[in-house]
Amino acid sequence: MPTINQLIKKGRKSAAVKTKSPALQSCPQKRGVCTSVKTITPKKPNSALRKVARIRLSNGIEVTAYIPGIGHNLQEHSVVLVRGGRVKDLPGVRYHIIRGTKDALGVEDRKRGRSKYGAKRPKA
């Protein structure tokens, strides 16, 4: 426990805030190339085959990113844009692929929440 004089001289050191997406290096998004595309199973109590891709970012860091939406066209060597945002039931997946940019096409026949999946407005 410090004395009053020690606190006056030095002061308290505030804890450094730890980033949740360190591979992006304070950028909103990063470009990357898919090295592999696969499915993984979520942790209990959920059950599914979640689509993920292993991506080498433009800064050389390799991350695992989730592919949102139903169906995708990604394969090895696809160029994608990656944003932060974890998937709660997939351990180690802390990034999302942005649909509708670069080689990742938007979700087909999406009517609601289109902007999150890169879907164009349907014809009336």
UniProtKB/Swiss-Prot annotation:
The keyword Cytoplasm belongs to this UniProt entry's keyword annotation: no
GO biological process: translation
PROSITE patterns: RIBOSOMAL_S12
Molecular function GO labels: rRNA binding; structural constituent of ribosome; tRNA binding
Modification type 3-methylthioaspartic acid: residues: 89
Alphabetically ordered keywords of this record: Methylation, Ribonucleoprotein, Ribosomal protein, RNA-binding, rRNA-binding, tRNA-binding
Positions of region (Disordered): 104-124
Pfam families with a match to the protein in the record: Ribosom_S12_S23
UniProt biased composition (Basic residues): 112-124
GO CC annotations on file: small ribosomal subunit
Superkingdom of origin organism: Bacteria
Protein family per UniProt: Belongs to the universal ribosomal protein uS12 family.
Subunit structure: Part of the 30S ribosomal subunit. Contacts proteins S8 and S17. May interact with IF1 in the 30S initiation complex.
Role: With S4 and S5 plays an important role in translational accuracy.
Name of this chain's protein: Small ribosomal subunit protein uS12
Gene giving rise to this polypeptide: rpsL
